A protein has these predicted regions:
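An aromatic- and glycine-enriched ligand-binding surface/loop that stacks and positions planar moieties
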Residues: 5, 13-16, 30-177, 297-302, ...
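Long, intrinsically disordered, low-complexity segments
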Residues: 7, 76-135, 205, 210, ...
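Flexible helix-coil transition and linker loops at the boundaries of alpha-helical arrays
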Residues: 20-27
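Alpha-helix C-terminal capping/termination sites
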Residues: 46, 221, 228, 278-279
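Short edge-strand/loop segments of extracellular domains
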Residues: 61, 238-247
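C-terminal substrate/ligand-recognition segments
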Residues: 151, 155-240
Length: 346
């Protein structure tokens, strides 16, 4: 594992030194210096190398790269094909529906992706990757400065009461159907990267670019690094920037009991990341970095929100069991597995 992390660091340091700070014109959307630095910061954070991660993120947040990034006014613009490669995009994978000639790597095959249909509502898509119901509850725990529900809720998730919760923004139909007509029951679906606002069905050729890293994520990562390094007071600034876009009160006002307590701040930051970044492929890495799977206390916090974690056993459920046929065919596999486990224990 140290060798792998070492190679990741080497590659991304080299990339950040060679890549341009920005691309323009037809080249816009290609990976940049800032993207390499943000990816490297992620790698450092997973290793708890907070000072190194902070150094990389500083370039984007307060350093020379700050001029290239910001938060878009409308949260939804991060998940629309009409507002791609915007100021909030740090690393964005480009997709297109121009070619729909199949799903392989052959010439003329699709340039789109399949997330929209795989995560789609039953009857519209495959209903894989359902969102967790506790997310809806978490969004509803706090109101905006105007007393309304968090606007990120209706952009992020589709659920039974979304039309009732947002009567001014919703028509009550999704892909041309009411919730009752769709027979979607109590399921909670990810709305991010869906196309319900301009289609009545989904296919395997979605043109929506996938935002691997948004500037909001960078700000929250920077806040986490500051907090871990003992600078909780300054960390508030960057969380509040993300909350302000959602019309939420500053963290100090909403949760004064946190103060400068490092653990209380981290606990709230964990929730802030879930509210801002759910469905964007960061949750598993977050939970692993916070080591919530490693202790009964961390696991209890997960179970309190999501009872499905009751099946998880600390020290046992971290990996899937080795297939019996692989063990039978390779007499060395158990030896290698035991050695790796011993290395991790040390």
């Amino acid at each position: 594992l140290p060798e792998i992390w070492g190679q990741v660091e080497k590659d991304l340091l080299e990339a950040s030194n060679l890549l341009p700070e920005e691309w323009t014109g037809a080249e816009k959307g290609r990976i940049t210096k800032g993207a390499a630095k943000a990816l490297l910061a992620r790698a450092y954070m997973q290793q708890h190398l907070w000072e190194k991660a902070k150094e990389q993120l500083y370039w984007l947040v307060e350093g020379e790269g700050k001029k290239y990034y910001g938060l878009v006014d409308n949260y939804k613009h991060n998940f629309s094909h009409l507002t791609e490669n915007n100021i909030e995009s740090v690393f964005e994978i480009q997709f297109s529906d121009a070619l729909n000639g199949g799903e392989s790597d052959d010439k003329g095959a699709t340039n789109g992706h399949q997330r929209s249909i795989i995560f789609g509502l039953s009857g519209i898509g495959f209903r894989d990757g359902l969102a967790r119901p506790w997310l809806v509850d978490e969004y509803k725990k706090e109101r905006t400065i105007d007393g309304k529900l968090d606007p990120r809720l209706r952009v992020s998730l589709l659920y039974k009461d979304v039309a009732t919760d947002f009567p001014d923004e919703e028509t009550g139909k999704f892909y041309g159907k009411t919730w009752a007509e769709g027979k979607w029951g109590n399921d909670v679906y990810y709305r991010k990267y869906s196309r319900d606002d301009f289609r009545t069905t989904e296919d395997r050729h979605s043109q929506l670019n996938f935002r691997v890293i948004r500037y909001a994520d960078v700000l929250l990562m920077y806040a986490e690094c500051l907090n871990e390094l003992g600078n909780t007071e300054d960390a508030y600034t960057y969380v509040n920037m993300v909350r302000a876009r959602a019309q939420m009160r500053p963290l100090q006002e909403a949760y004064p009991e946190i103060g400068n307590d490092k653990q209380k701040f981290l606990s709230r930051l964990q929730t802030e990341r879930a509210l801002e970044l759910n469905g964007e492929c960061v949750r598993w890495f977050d939970i692993k970095r916070w080591e919530l799977y490693n202790t009964p206390e961390g696991l209890a916090a997960l179970i309190a929100r999501d009872p499905d974690y009751k099946n998880f056993v600390v020290g046992v459920s971290h990996r899937q069991p080795l297939p019996s046929n692989e063990v039978a065919n390779n007499p060395n596999i158990c030896l290698l597995y035991t050695s790796d486990a011993a290395d991790e224990a040390r």
